[in-house]
Amino acid sequence: MNKAWIPLRLRDTILHRPDFFLGTEYAQMSINTTDASTPNTSISGPGINPDTGKIDPHAVTISGLALDASYTPDALPTSLVNFERDINNPGEFPYTRGLFPQGYRTRLWTMRQFAGFGSADDTNERFKYILAQTKTKTAANTGLSTAFDLPTLMGRDSDDVLSLGEVGKCGVAIDTIEDMHRLYADIPIDQVTVSQTINAPACVIWAMYLAMAKQRNIAWDQLGGTLQNDILKEFHAQNEFIYPPEASTKLVVDTIEFQSQHVPKWNSVSISGYHIREAGSSATQELAFTLRDGMEYVEACLIRGLDIEEFAPRLSFFFNAHNEFFEEIAKLRAARRIWARMMKDRYGAKNKRSWFMKTHVQTAGCSLTEQQPYNNIVRVAYQAMAGVLGGCQSLHTDSMDETLGLPTEQAVTIALRTQQILAHETGVTRTTDPLGGSYFMEALTDKVEAEALAFIEEIDNMGRGPWKPEYATTSTIDDGGCVQGIHKGYFRRKIAEASYRFSEECEAGDRVIVGVNEYVDPNEDRQVEILSISQEVETVQVQTLQEFKAKRDTATTAAALQAIRDAARNNENVMPSLIEGALANCTLGEMVQAMADIYGRYTGGPEW
């Protein structure tokens, strides 16, 4: 049986060490014990054919939520019975229907296209291309989103032996403050919002960015953008972590605290479900794990003594828009409702902007196929529409060739034009939450919410339990439900189970993937232009880095690195010392290692 539907890293780990993802009780599980065509009559429940034990794809969503054939006023969903409490009007608590009464009539979503490859100069050129494609009188609210290469994501310099062969391959290589200057050269960073997709070394990259702004004489209060900075989901799904969960969470709080005091227009963390979904989770798991990660950061900030009204309005979220059209819309509606209630009722926030969930949405990379890649344009268009109908504040549309390599300029342009057609030709911007009030949509939103809340309760109970005000002075980061869930392997196990189930459904033909398991073209020509990165990029980047190190004042650099160690050792906020480190020409890898000298590096898996 072909296991191609399990994400590659996840599949390889399951096959070679099933206990790591699925727990010791599953260690002897055979991944391929029966043929997919063999009925499994032990399975039953809503949406399952009792004769075959197989799902009815017309009755169950991708996430396994059973659907009725039709919805009528004879069985109104709970939310419609309690309209003001559960749904209300757009712009009114609990914001199920959106944050603002006029929706996209007064402000379109930000068209934020992800870009990054090769050197800082290469990516700067792509940034300028993207800005040029969006600079019109009707679409001025654009932003940049930066993809970093694997060495940068792991906090390693380009000349590190572990970086060899990866420099500039899946994103841009950033080692120094000079790289940061080249990356944003001739771009008015006080006018364009900048998103940085970086997590484990997020505090260091952000420090370099702030130091660059200082050298350009741009006040920090003029900077707008978003730092992804969501380290918890790295332990759940993406595996790009450096420090232990407790120290990693502390660094997130450092950035949140520094942002609230010095960079008021910046979103200090983008709490990300996208990667959780890409790893194979269901929509409800994505929603629950993302919200609970956000709650973990809120609780860590309260333990630090921060004022919730100071930091909560700048928290943001990042969700996936997958193929199950209505489920994705329901997910975003339920997300706003749950978050608003948690912030108001559980954490006591009074300012309505602290209740707001601002969301960025990206179409589902894991849904794109190598086979018949032009079909991906259609997939992305529908997914983008789901994100918009769900009320996102910004949107990234994937390029159709991203399963094959880095996107070409033509593919990037088509992806961007998809958003522009959606915004200006379809009419979806004219009415806020146009599906609101639908018997089906409200019932599905309720169902997604209920399943997500059940997951959140499980995670709460793995730690200190549901938040109480006294925990601000009696608890620590170590007691958080997410931190404890990481150590117990909860998140990886749940994601692996969902991923494996979806894989089986696809291979059995229960889930049709056009061009892959149905409507296959045996004579298909897959010759699609792809963007490749020359080995010369790495050679030049390493040479430039070594020249940078040779010309700096080593005594100043050494003193700055020691200051970073001292701040970490004394449990201080590391941001001021990191900014000074960037100004003293410390490299990314050096500053990351200075903190690793104190916090250590996390190499262990779940404690099973």
Q: Can you name each region flagged by the protein language model?
A:
Residues 2, 12, 16-19:
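Intrinsic-disorder-associated, low-complexity terminal segments enriched in Asp/Asn/His/Tyr and depleted
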Residues 307-311, 349-363, 371-400, 407-432, ...:
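Flexible glycine/proline-rich, aromatic-decorated loop/lid segments
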Residues 175, 200, 239-259, 336, ...:
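Phosphate/diphosphate-binding loops
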Residues 165-168, 233-243, 276-281, 319-324, ...:
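Short beta-alpha connecting loops at secondary-structure transitions
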Residues 40-41, 46-53, 59-76, 148-150, ...:
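Flexible, glycine-rich loop/tail regions that form catalytic "lids" or insertion modules at the edges
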Residues 117, 126-133, 177-187, 208-212, ...:
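Generic, well-ordered alpha-helical scaffold segments in large soluble proteins
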Residues 25-322, 327, 346, 353-360, ...:
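Catalytic alpha/beta active-site cores
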